[in-house]
Amino acid sequence: MSVFRDLVEGECSEPNALGNFVQHFTNERSYHDKFEDHGKNEFYDSLYRHEEEYNEQRHLDSIFDGEGQEDDIHLMMDRHLNLRDGPREHKELPLSNVESDLQFLFQDFINSTRAGQLFHPSSLNHLPLTFEDKSKIKNRSSIMLKHFSNGESEQFEEDQLNRMLDSLGIEVGDDFDQVWDSQPHHTTTTTTTTTTTTTGQYDQYQKYVNDLPEEYEDYEQHQQELFDDGDLEDYELDEEWDKGDDFHPYDSAWTESDRSVEAAWDETARRTISDITRPITQINDPKLKKSNFMKFMNQLNSGEASIVGSDVVHNPDFKRQEEYQQQADQWTEDYNDFHEHIPQHRIQEYQFSIQEARDSDTLERGMGLFNEGHLSDSIIALESEVKRNPENAMAWMYLGIAHAENDQDSQATTCLIKSLQIDPTNSKARLALAVSHTNDYQKERALDTLEEWLQRTPEYTALYKQFKGSVDPNSFLDTWSRHEFTTNLFIEAARSRPSNPDPEVQTALGLLYNMSYDYDKAVDCFKAALQNSPTDYQLWNKLGATLANSNRSQEALGAYFKALEHKPSYVRARSNLGISYLSLNMFQESATTFLGAIAIHPAPNIWDNLKMVFRLMNREDLVQKADLRDVNAFLDEFQFM
């Protein structure tokens, strides 16, 4: 079933490890959603586009128009692995999420096209794309599809393109040339100025649109000649395309996503060091301010020093490089000390939803509400508990888990870090933190946390030290090399228990393989974990989401049913189940499932999913009813209670 079977037994698979479990079921999510969530959003269209804050529009325009491209767009590639499922509650969407979502959307589009698999994007139709943005995306998508498709059918290419456009709220049938002609004035907003498009700009834009087919034909002919000569690699083809074409940062999203992963991470480090170091230099901690580490961060931020490859290079106008080299050990020590201070700094950022603790809201009440699926109420109760008892590590952990299930991973991360600060031995909290880091696009931190989990687990401490000892501490690993190292580390941990798999190790491996899109291997790992944790509802949901992300929605149904069997109030599994039904064109079942989820937790994104199903059913009357946000209004037609 999976190439992972070729590895030694006991890694992520063993005899009878739930191998064909889905055949027993006849019923039944960030980046690409949270890996716990179903990759469902190819169905979203422009009906649900939401207007963002004015500043976000300006920021997005600056990305497309070339301003600020040195600021943070490349940092986002390191910070945002798009594994989300469903439209975010983007009311407070950080500006930095916009370009990262586009980056990974383009990368997933290319990767899935190359693999000959249908695209499963997250919905980004809430982004405030301008008319020109949409036109460029549509044309560029068509070209890149032709470039990377490996002889797939026309139907596949059409479906693939439609899924890409739907995810951004771009109507497939839009005639941009005609619409443009009908608009006498076209205004482009940037971060610094607002200008009206001139006739010359229009002519240039019109020429760009009209010339694309011919340009692409010439490009493809030239490309074939180079291929025949055997002189051109994939990345060189993109460079040929880029010649003579002044790409905006949008276009760089295409080219960045098609370079080698290692080069992309190196470019990220090179171009965004100022953004990485600036917030560190602003930490108001007297001990850190006097440290050599903070001095080094200030030098990187000011340009006194820079990172080239794996070396630190200093400006010759400043102190000699040899002097700084002698301080390397001290910097390392200061950096470790910095990590000890970071948790307290982050916990100060936690945003409480209550002002005062309520006596009736205890840990027990919060846990009860959580188990019943009342996430918002459970969060309030758990906040009361940690306000009364700020050293209650268990309360902080469950508050973090509740936030994670409520799709609030930044808040979850803060709570879980606080829990681990109080009790570093809590392996459940550390593994949950790794998941939230992944969901919040913090890949490096997810890898750090997974390695910390292994290091702090007595059974694997010796293995961890042995592995770390084999790596040159002065060597530089880009993120994907680091990912490979961490994966191999957990593979060895899994091999140490061939006949009795550790479900936590297998879960970590499933997470790592989801990061690298190795869904078959991830499926094997989750199945092996379930053999020893058959009642873990979150694990069943992870399995279902991974199956769905690998275009196996029919199999995913069974996994979601098992998750709900063990926790009927698990809203995320209900939502994912509704999406799987939708993927299979089972609209009645999908609507019923979404209504059941809303009855437990009326999240706006689930209402949006429901309205989309009603539109696919051609039931505008139900769409209007859904706008009232009254779930009881559907009891006469749907049995969901």
UniProtKB/Swiss-Prot annotation:
Residues 261-288 are annotated as: Amphipathic helix 4 (AH4). A motif (WxxxF/Y motif) lies at residues 331-335. It is found in: Cytoplasm, Cytosol; Peroxisome matrix. Keywords: Cytoplasm, Peroxisome, Protein transport, Repeat, Thioester bond, TPR repeat, Translocation, Transport, Ubl conjugation. TPR repeats lie at residues 359-392, 393-426, 427-460, 503-536, 538-570, 571-604. GO terms for cellular component: cytosol; peroxisomal matrix; peroxisomal membrane; peroxisome. GO terms for molecular function: peroxisome matrix targeting signal-1 binding; peroxisome targeting sequence binding. Monoubiquitinated at Cys-12 by PEX2 during PEX5 passage through the retrotranslocation channel. Cys-12 monoubiquitination acts as a recognition signal for the PEX1-PEX6 complex and is required for PEX5 extraction and export from peroxisomes. When PEX5 recycling is compromised, polyubiquitinated by PEX10 during its passage through the retrotranslocation channel, leading to its degradation. Residues 74-92 are annotated as: Amphipathic helix 2 (AH2). Coiled coil: none annotated. It holds the Pfam family TPR_17. Residues 12-34 are annotated as: Amphipathic helix 1 (AH1). The TPR repeats mediate interaction with proteins containing a C-terminal PTS1-type tripeptide peroxisomal targeting signal (SKL-type). The WxxxF/Y motifs mediate interaction with PEX14, promoting association with the PEX13-PEX14 docking complex. Receptor that mediates peroxisomal import of proteins containing a C-terminal PTS1-type tripeptide peroxisomal targeting signal (SKL-type). Binds to cargo proteins containing a PTS1 peroxisomal targeting signal in the cytosol, and translocates them into the peroxisome matrix by passing through the PEX13-PEX14 docking complex along with cargo proteins. PEX5 receptor is then retrotranslocated into the cytosol, leading to release of bound cargo in the peroxisome matrix, and reset for a subsequent peroxisome import cycle. This is Peroxisomal targeting signal 1 receptor. It comes from Dictyostelium discoideum.
